């Protein structure tokens, strides 16, 4: 079981993940942008860390900042929620290579989905 999960998302999805973690007795870390510092997910999490500015590319999609947040908070798993990094092969692979659990599909499954979905959709 995980001891601490970093939630790499915001809003309602992050709130739901945090509430589920609390039910299981798992500590949570919320990442946030500079403008989301008063958001509900930040208030509900056990810890929070600002990972960048209001632009998603500078915060919720900023893999180096998120990796730093994982290290600083000593998180042993990451839950991406949906959107943002949930289907990012490189992110999932980096986590796997660093023995950090990714709460989601394996990097291979993410890669396979991105290769086959366009083909299936064009049929």
Report the location of each language-model feature.
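ATP-binding N-terminal substructure of ATP-dependent carboxylate-amine bond-forming enzymes
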Residues: 1-112
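Single conserved hydrophobic/aromatic residue that forms the stacking wall/gate
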Residues: 112-123
């Amino acid at each position: 079981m995980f001891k601490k999960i970093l939630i790499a998302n915001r809003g309602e999805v992050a709130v739901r993940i945090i509430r589920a973690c609390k039910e299981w007795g798992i500590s949570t870390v919320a990442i946030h942008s500079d403008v989301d510092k008063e958001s509900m997910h930040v208030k509900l999490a056990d810890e929070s860390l600002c990972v960048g500015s209001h632009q998603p590319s500078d915060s919720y999609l900023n893999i180096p900042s998120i990796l730093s947040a994982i290290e600083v908070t000593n998180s042993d798993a990451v839950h991406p929620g949906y959107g943002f990094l949930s289907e990012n092969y490189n992110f999932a692979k980096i986590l796997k290579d660093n023995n950090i659990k990714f709460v989601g599909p394996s990097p291979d499954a993410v890669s396979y989905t991105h290769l086959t979905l366009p083909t299936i959709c064009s049929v």
